[in-house]
Amino acid sequence: MTTDRNLFFCASLLIFLGVLMSYSLSTYTTVVLYHYGEFHFFIRQLVSAIMGIIIMWGLSRVDPRKWFSRLGFFLLFVPSLLIIGMFFLPESLSSSAGGAKRWIRLGFFSLAPLEFLKIGFTFFLAWSLSRTFVAKEKANVKEELITFVPYSFVFVALAIGVGVLQNDLGQIVLLGAVLAVLLVFSGGSVHLFGLIVSGAFAISVLAIVTSEHRILRLKLWWSNLQNSLFTLLPDKLANALRISDLPESYQVFHAGNAMHNGGLLGQGLGLGQIKLGFLSEVHTDMVLAGIAEEWGFLGLCVCFILFSVMIVLIFRIANRLKEPKYSLFCVGVVLLIGFSLVINAFGVGGIFPVKGLAVPFLSYGGSSLLANCIAIGLVLSLARYTKG
């Protein structure tokens, strides 16, 4: 089998596993909390999965020389306009949650424009960086900073639209990481990368300390982390460093219990306990904890192996491509998938604060699934282009 066929098969297998877990982990939530039919979330995710696989296959057949840029700019501008437009829509079409509007209701389907904007932003970076950093000869840090200034304005606008209007710092962290690493892949120096990371860290600290909600999340994270870290220290030193009266991290605590209950081989599909009201939305952001409980450590390893294979295959395709914008886009897709997985996994494990990022292909959510299928479909079209 060729690389692109392996990639299509790998993505389809992850999608199948995601649909399977959307049923196994959502039954309690569906029936008890929302009073829907038992198969409500399963059917919605199954429909999204079928649509996603069809879209992925269809995009793999298009000629990127004609359609890549058109689709990329479409995914950049249309979701941006929708994110702005959501705040002018009535509650019946775009309901508020925590002071933010993130979904547009379209009858049976709810659309999250940000998921598609992430693909459009990755395209924009690949298209633009190939015309600036890649096209230029090696420059000093000052010249690199001057070249980077327009990107900083674009990112600030994105941060306002997503981080402020949608109150979603996690997505900004993800997109900022993609921007910083793609700069290195496009020829930016390590010094520039260090300056950008330092600036991003300072801005992140400012964003956290000015939000009570984010401060609480940070406290929840440290509450769990200090309990783990201080077991390695002598009792006197641990007691001196420990900050008392911190709230317990509800999500991470039960996620840890789920992983402990799963052991090596798991409780069995559908037999997990964490979904029974302990973490009612386990089929979304905490899906890895649900998989660990029902499939065990080995089942979780299988998922990570599939993601690793997918990343290697996309890198192989990127290495074959001669046009920088195509190869940079493939690298950007790897970064989106890889960083989303790592940030989510570290959040579930208590290493990072919980950010609310979905696990690509596995977490429940039609918009996230379709957006990732579009990304893989575009990569497959580029792989086919290298043959023709």
Swiss-Prot record:
Residues 1-6, 60-70, 127-144, 187, 316-327, 380-388 are cytoplasmic. It is found in: Cell inner membrane. One of its GO terms (cellular component) is cell division site. Keywords: Cell cycle, Cell division, Cell inner membrane, Cell membrane, Cell shape, Cell wall biogenesis/degradation, Glycosyltransferase, Membrane, Peptidoglycan synthesis, Transferase, Transmembrane, Transmembrane helix. It catalyses: [GlcNAc-(1->4)-Mur2Ac(oyl-L-Ala-gamma-D-Glu-L-Lys-D-Ala-D-Ala)](n)-di-trans,octa-cis-undecaprenyl diphosphate + beta-D-GlcNAc-(1->4)-Mur2Ac(oyl-L-Ala-gamma-D-Glu-L-Lys-D-Ala-D-Ala)-di-trans,octa-cis-undecaprenyl diphosphate = [GlcNAc-(1->4)-Mur2Ac(oyl-L-Ala-gamma-D-Glu-L-Lys-D-Ala-D-Ala)](n+1)-di-trans,octa-cis-undecaprenyl diphosphate + di-trans,octa-cis-undecaprenyl diphosphate + H(+). The keyword Secreted does not apply. The keyword Heme does not apply. GO terms for molecular function: lipid-linked peptidoglycan transporter activity; peptidoglycan glycosyltransferase activity. It is a multi-pass membrane protein. Peptidoglycan polymerase that is essential for cell division. This is Probable peptidoglycan glycosyltransferase FtsW.
